[in-house]
Amino acid sequence: MNTTEKKELMGKYAKKLENTIKREAAVMKEIENDKALIKYLEGQKTSGAAFDNTVYESYDAWIETIRKQIKKSESTLTNIEFKKVELEAIQKYIA
């Protein structure tokens, strides 16, 4: 594989990285929404509101699931930051 072919291949990979990086705002919004939902559910639980949900067995179970989703999203943000650095390196290589 010659240098031109390598640069073409890395250019294609750079496009994939760019698409992944574009998700950053959506992931951040998802975290924000999840945190707001936790606050709401904790308020409902504290106020003694009846639990009416067929998916989760309790407010605590629902809140715990959302906390896990937040951790996953935070991990995704960390990966996106790494991909930004990786993309920058690739762009310098193919320039």
Locations of the language-model features?
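Extended alpha-helical coiled-coil "stalk/arm" regions
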Residues: 24-63
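N-terminal cationic leader/targeting segments used for protein routing and processing
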Residues: 3, 7-8, 16-17, 46, ...
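N-terminal compositionally biased, intrinsically disordered segments and leader/signal-like regions
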Residues: 4, 21, 47, 55, ...
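Generic detector of low-complexity/intrinsically disordered segments
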Residues: 11, 19, 39, 43, ...
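Amphipathic alpha-helical coiled-coil segments
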Residues: 23-28, 61-94
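Short, flexible coil/linker elements and helix-boundary hinge sites characteristic
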Residues: 13-14, 32, 45-48, 74-75, ...
